[in-house]
Amino acid sequence: MTSQKGLRYDGSIDKYPITEGEIYSLGNGSKITIADITLGLPEFSKNADCVFIDPAGSKGVLKAYYTKAEKQCPVDNFDEFVAHIKRCIEQINPDRLFVECFYRNKKQLVPMVESLFPHVKIYENTYYHKPDCKCWIIQGTKQAEDWGLQGMDEWDAVFKICKDVPFCSITDFFMGQGLVAQAAYDAGKVFYGSDMNRNRLAVAISKVAKRGGEWTVTK
């Protein structure tokens, strides 16, 4: 059973009690809100020209995410979840897509990206800055590009993407605790974030605030 402390993460929800329907915004137009992609994307996310996502790696992991968000998992299998991801990307129609994946979900996510973009590049990466923790970043682009992400830790890769890739705005519809938000904020870029877990989003909001971000809240 998930502990109450685990559900609340670091307790940022007490300071940033984001609720359904609220939008947290920065002066540059960056926004964060609660959303479940199986029910649809926030409209502002569709304005992004770049996407970075790190989706659940399996049906079991996905179910655990919903449990932590105190919600019922609405999909019957992982392929159905991937179909929702693809639909969201099609609605956004970005110039560039970056999808972090693992051994368990790579076989579903690579074909998905290949069906959406004419140019696909796969970087081999690590996570937690541990050489034995392997992951991949699948890059989909409209033109052939190499952003030098091979061999990087995924944390560093996200900061490099936000610093070097010439996008106007980036969205992460699995924002979680806000790695993309932090990287985009540091790079002076606009970001759009959403997640179904309000406690995780509160952590993201807090981390950006600690970097100097000043949030306003609207309904």
Over which residues does each language-model region extend?
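Class I S-adenosyl-L-methionine-dependent methyltransferase catalytic core
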Residues: M1-K219
